[in-house]
Amino acid sequence: LVRWMHVTQSKQQVESADRLGLITNMPAGDSEGDPKDRRFEQRLELMRDSMIYNRNNPSILFYESGNKGISEDHMKRMKTIYDQYDPHGGRVIGSREMLDPGSVAQYGGEMLYVNKSAGKPLWAHEYSRDEAARAYQDNFTPPFHIDAPDYNRNVESMAVEDVRRWWDYYQQRPGSGDRISAGGVKIGFTDSNSHFRGDNNYRRSGVIDAVRLEKDPWYVHQVMWDGWVNSDVPHTYIIGHWTYAAGVVKPIYVVSNGESVELFLNGKSLGKGERSSGFLYTFKDIAWQPGELKAVSTYADGRTSEYVLKTAGAPAAIRLTPHTGPRGLVADGADLMLVDVEVVDKAGQRVPTAFNAIHFKLDGAAIWKGGIAQMEGPADPAKKTSANGILATTLPVELGVNRVLIRSTTKAGKVTLNATADGLTSASINLASKPVAVKDGLLPVFAEDYQPSDLSRGPTPAGPSYTPFRRTIAVANIVAGSNSADAGKSHDDNETTAWSSDGTPENAWIEYDLAKAQAVSHLSLRLTGWRLRAYPIRITLDNKVVFEGVTPKSLGYVDLDMTPATGSKLRITLTGPTKDLDAFGNIVELKNNKEAQSVGADAVPTGWRLSVVEADITGPPQ
């Protein structure tokens, strides 16, 4: 799913998604709010016009009425437009937030937080907002930028955080019971010239940079996302590189969808990694030695996959690799050629520690559009006003690679690009741009007519695209130590309601009657104040303790694996007072205090109050 934000995407973007088979949303236009004046009338008009313009494009599945929750009356007015202009398009209309199952909004989901529903699709409209420049790999790689969460991370740190944040949603995926999360979209999938929070002057949340060179998080998401619902295509990826200075000792992170990962250095086993967040395997305190680092993943069915890193030698030469469209470089004045520039060792392997300055010289029927780079040191205050190397003819490689753009002219002819650097063997490319027919100043064909469509994944499965791994257990009745009239709000598939106890220790419990003895193994809880508040609790099943501990803070739900047992009455008891301390204090654009509506901590004081928004009781699948 690609989510466009705030403004209706261009027709080119819509049609590109059609060609690639990418599901997208379509926003109308908003300034992140719910205005009560003429501005909302304009939004309605824009939704109408955009819907008419794009309703025949199959990639659009969601009409987005706002990048923020809107009133139910405003949502009804948007739904009226949908009913009039696209009643049979097979799409849904909704808005960010809009969690109430009684709303006319046909989908919803908060920014960042994990939402679940048994009815409408709820998906996170933005997750993992952290930023990292592609140039900053880790603390031990030039330019030796020290990791500084959350908006000045190193790429290694950002990749690890992306695994942790996606795991929040993956645990609640289809197959986990009746109430599920529909997933989430990674905000800022590419670095962009937009609102930023780090020490640069552009947004660096992308898993690829501004010229579409991959960072480690690109490959991390490939591991986690390759499948219809489950990550079921074997992948293993070692974050980073294996070219360090003597004496470096650091953790090695491997991302894999296997059941175990073993690490080998020059053929010798370094043991198996410590698994966390489903996909992350950590190998602590690995001492660098030159050679080959290999990770081997083993799957439940005995299959294996592996990934290998090799130590690079000293920088020796420049390598240029051009990328053009299927027709080559077309002399239409708009076509682009992307050229990768790498610094390689004498064996041709990229040197991941190289930051050599490359001098470019372009001749012929083309226009230099250049690339992008950090250009300053990691602590340089000029970053905020930097031109980022835009249009510069001297650019450094970053971690051994960069990319530049060259635009064609309207005249066909030879194009030559030379790249030189001190102490390195130079490189050049030579090609000719191709003429195109022009009639009355217009082109009779368009570039998209020549773009291939990759359908190698095959059709959407005709049957279920997942295998249930948990089963929801029905609740017949709920009683509580206090406020029993509201106890049902803890199990009503509505994240806008909650039950809370009265603040006395003896009344801080709630009990779910399962009607008959059931095999229970798992409890998924959305607790009031979940990102601020930890709850010391005891869970019993027919008076037998199946869990006792403190709930972790989260971005929505805590998943508690209980001692498997069979019983008919599950009770949750608060065993100590609660207190608030934000576990995600640097998340900008989220209210970091108790007033955040979706957290609800402002309405329920700390202390001896157990407060449950939703309790999902599950057992093994039948």
PLM regions and their residue ranges:
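Short flexible loop/turn segments that cap and initiate beta-strands
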Residues: V249, N257, L263-L270, Y307-V308, ...
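Edge beta-strands of extracellular beta-sandwich domains
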Residues: G302-G313, T425-P435
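Short beta-strand-plus-loop segments that form exposed binding edges in beta-rich domains
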Residues: T573-D580, D602-V604
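Short proline/glycine-enriched turn/loop motifs at strand-loop junctions of beta-rich domains
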Residues: V255-S260, T353, A517-Q518, R531-A534
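Substrate-binding/catalytic cleft of secreted carbohydrate-active enzymes
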Residues: R3-P217, H221, N230-W242, T282
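Beta-strand-rich structural segments
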Residues: I238, I252-V255, A334-P352, T416-A419, ...
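Short, hydrophobic beta-strand segments
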Residues: F283-W288, G389-T410
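Disordered, acidic Ser/Thr/Pro-rich linker "stalks" and the adjacent N-terminal cap
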Residues: Y450-A517, R526-L532, P536, L541, ...
